[in-house]
Amino acid sequence: MPKPINVRVTTMDAELEFAIQPNTTGKQLFDQVVKTVGLREVWFFGLQYVDSKGYSTWLKLNKKVTQQDVKKENPLQFKFRAKFFPEDVSEELIQEITQRLFFLQVKEAILNDEIYCPPETAVLLASYAVQAKYGDYNKEIHKPGYLANDRLLPQRVLEQHKLTKEQWEERIQNWHEEHRGMLREDSMMEYLKIAQDLEMYGVNYFEIKNKKGTELWLGVDALGLNIYEHDDKLTPKIGFPWSEIRNISFNDKKFVIKPIDKKAPDFVFYAPRLRINKRILALCMGNHELYMRRRKPDTIEVQQMKAQAREEKHQKQLERAQLENEKKKREIAEKEKERIEREKEELMERLRQIEEQTMKAQKELEEQTRKALELDQERKRAKEEAERLEKERQAAEEAKSALAKQAADQMKNQEQLAAELAEFTAKIALLEEAKKKKEEEATEWQHKAFAAQEDLEKTKEELKTVMSAPPPPPPPPVIPPTENEHDEHDENNAEASAELSNDGVMNHRSEEERVTETQKNERVKKQLQALSSELAQARDETKKTQNDVLHAENVKAGRDKYKTLRQIRQGNTKQRIDEFEAM
């Protein structure tokens, strides 16, 4: 039994380890990887490895892994990466896993400056990356420094601006807040929609020379072949769409492209090494195939995938809406709970006040009862005194009568009796006065007693009202919220050729009608303008790179990726080939 070979495959967000047999083909390994990660849009991807000479190469799917020049390590190392890029991410990337892998790969390329990205766009893209990672901004969770360990901007951008880590975070956080309510997968798609308009996005660059020996760059991408001057990778000077190319071939370092236009000469360039031509041929074949596939009706498989993706997205939206609804319900329940607690406290306070008032009224009642008793006692004393005085008066009357009789009987002692009579008369007058006074006093005490009795009755009535008032209702119970292979061909010979068919294709050059996301989306346009003016104040102009200068010139001239594309494809194929030869 042959000994198995250990293999490690690194995707953009995981490390996979497999044991393969010595006779395992590239396709078998590739199929095992895509099955493990759950990927169906396999035509974009490939397995990359470093060969024994240190060059990065794509694994050929039709050959055994062991027959390829993979650097001898244990385990054998491969990277699972996007080999071909879509023309329009929002139209072509169907599965969420595909979108995420592209998002992570493009983000890494931007952060490493493999794709040039202007500073304002870099900050906006960073905010989408943050939304994709953290979800909605929440100041309770996302405290200052929450982005401290995240790599969000290219080093070039950091060095070109006089801003601290905290100031960068503040700017990114402000835009992060703007994306509230955006699903994580939608944030990744928004990132890609902006990134795909960057000039270097999805372009494979190769150093070439024309017949004159001028050093140039060949750019191979989803839309065709473009020629760049050696000091400018941003702005292509000549373009050939895939629909104009009939045959591609190479012989050693010479690469020949035959146009569909029979009147046009062959398009010939030279690469520094044979292996470069092999890579160019493989990329041309793969990109041409995808270019043509996009311009034909979707296969049944793609239609099914799109329908499934739509259903999954709809389901996620429903789940999110349900989650938001539950969240709102929970917030309402929390507020209701707080309101009930507040009302409960208010009712308890009122109850305390009523109890205090009741106690106060009770004390007042007791005091008034005491006073009423005292007044009643005083009234009784006054009455007794009045009765005593009445008796004395009667006695005096009797004495007066007796004296009067005595006076009549004793005329002789008239003077003496008259004096006594006068004395008793005076005494009677005094007693009359005292009696009157006591009667008035008794009447006054009687009135006071009546008033006290009325106060007592009133207080009793108030107390009765307070005590019989219904107790405050208990707070209602708080109900808890419910919560393709495109083989580079194993050419032992130093030549290879491929026919590129253009049959059955609709609307060959639809890409020339495209506009950038900034032109389509007013919100993105305003965001980028605001960021640009904000960053301009902190920019160190002495640290501009060649790409910064070239980008600024393009912006000033009103050029963008698609306007340039239309411009470099003008004229017939022969004119553009002549132009290439003259460079």
Swiss-Prot record:
Modified residues (N6-succinyllysine): K83
GO MF terms, alphabetically ordered: actin binding; cell adhesion molecule binding
Location of region: Disordered: 309-336, 374-407, 460-526
Subcellular localization: Cell membrane; Cytoplasm, Cytoskeleton; Cleavage furrow; Cell projection, Microvillus
Keywords: Actin capping, Actin-binding, Cell membrane, Cell projection, Cytoplasm, Cytoskeleton, Membrane, Phosphoprotein
GO cellular component, one term: cytoplasm
SMART domains: B41, FERM_C
Record note on modification: Phosphorylated by tyrosine-protein kinases. Phosphorylation by ROCK2 suppresses the head-to-tail association of the N-terminal and C-terminal halves resulting in an opened conformation which is capable of actin and membrane-binding.
Domain annotation FERM: ranges: 5-295
Biological processes, Gene Ontology terms: actin filament capping; positive regulation of early endosome to late endosome transport; positive regulation of protein localization to early endosome; regulation of cell shape; regulation of organelle assembly
Alphabetical list of InterPro entries matching this protein: Band_41_domain, ERM, ERM_C_dom, ERM_FERM_C, ERM_helical, Ez/rad/moesin-like, FERM/acyl-CoA-bd_prot_sf, FERM_2
One Pfam assignment: FERM_N
Binding of a 1,2-diacyl-sn-glycero-3-phospho-(1D-myo-inositol), residues: K60, L61, N62, K63, K278
Superkingdom of source: Eukaryota
Bilayer topology term: Peripheral membrane protein
PROSITE patterns: FERM_1, FERM_2, FERM_3
Residue(s) carrying Phosphothreonine: T564
CDD domains the UniProt entry points to: FERM_B-lobe, FERM_C_ERM, FERM_F1_ERM
Subunit structure: Interacts with CPNE1 (via VWFA domain) and CPNE4 (via VWFA domain). Binds NHERF1. Interacts with NHERF1, NHERF2, LAYN, MME/NEP and ICAM2. Interacts (via FERM domain) with SPN/CD43 cytoplasmic tail. Interacts with CD44. Interacts with CLIC5; may work together in a complex which also includes EZR and MYO6 to stabilize linkages between the plasma membrane and subjacent actin cytoskeleton at the base of stereocilia.
PANTHER family, per database record: MERLIN/MOESIN/EZRIN/RADIXIN (PTHR23281)
Comment text on domains: The N-terminal domain interacts with the C-terminal domain of LAYN. An interdomain interaction between its N-terminal and C-terminal domains inhibits its ability to bind LAYN. In the presence of acidic phospholipids, the interdomain interaction is inhibited and this enhances binding to LAYN.
Role summary: Probably plays a crucial role in the binding of the barbed end of actin filaments to the plasma membrane.
The protein, known as: Radixin
